UniProtKB/Swiss-Prot annotation:
This is Adrenodoxin, mitochondrial. Belongs to the adrenodoxin/putidaredoxin family. Its cofactor is [2Fe-2S] cluster. GO terms for cellular component: mitochondrial matrix; mitochondrion. The modification N6-acetyllysine is found at residue 66. It comes from Homo sapiens. Interacts with CYP11A1.
């Protein structure tokens, strides 16, 4: 009974959060209800999360699951790095300390457009559907193309190995656009 309640709570939180965090919580909630990730503990019947680390989960961070990504910076320099399957492109830039000025100013909260990236056609076609929230932020980005997405919303998959993404020549922080609108 507590497992079902915990799963419902995780799914409800996923709807509120949206984006990658929401998708993760929804997935966790679905798994919690079906595989017993939440189990009753003690005489009071309180739910406590239990987690077992399988060999396959530990292997996720192995070099086999590392994806090579090439970023073409604003000045035309190519920055090549690796990221883990499931990491967002914002995570890849931050974790590898790539020198992309102002990238990810809002830390992936969909409050700016500084992680705006332009994708190759064959990669763009395989990306998950864009959300309304991401689309709203992209509307405020400079250099918008029909292959533009926000790096905080794109998670690496094996099919993206060796992809190249381009950082637009100019950057707009949507938070500044909103602030300017409020003061005038």
């Amino acid at each position: 009974m507590a497992a079902a309640g915990g799963a419902r709570l995780l799914r409800a939180a996923s709807a509120v959060l949206g984006g990658p965090a929401g998708r993760w919580l929804h997935h966790a909630g679905s798994r919690a209800g079906s595989s017993g990730l939440l189990r009753n503990r003690g005489p009071g019947g309180s739910a406590e999360a239990s987690r077992s680390l399988s060999v396959s989960a530990r292997a996720r961070s192995s070099s086999e699951d590392k994806i090579t990504v090439h970023f073409i910076n604003r000045d035309g320099e190519t920055l090549t790095t690796k990221g883990k399957v499931g990491d967002s492109l914002l995570d890849v830039v931050v974790e590898n300390n790539l020198d992309i000025d102002g990238f990810g100013a809002c830390e992936g909260t969909l409050a700016c457009s500084t992680c705006h990236l332009i994708f190759e056609d064959h990669i763009y076609e395989k990306l998950d559907a864009i959300t309304d929230e991401e689309n709203d932020m992209l509307d405020l980005a400079y250099g918008l193309t029909d292959r533009s997405r926000l790096g905080c919303q794109i998670c690496l998959t094996k099919s993206m190995d060796n992809m190249t993404v381009r950082v637009p020549e100019t950057v707009a922080d949507a938070r500044q656009s909103i602030d300017v609108g409020k003061t005038s």
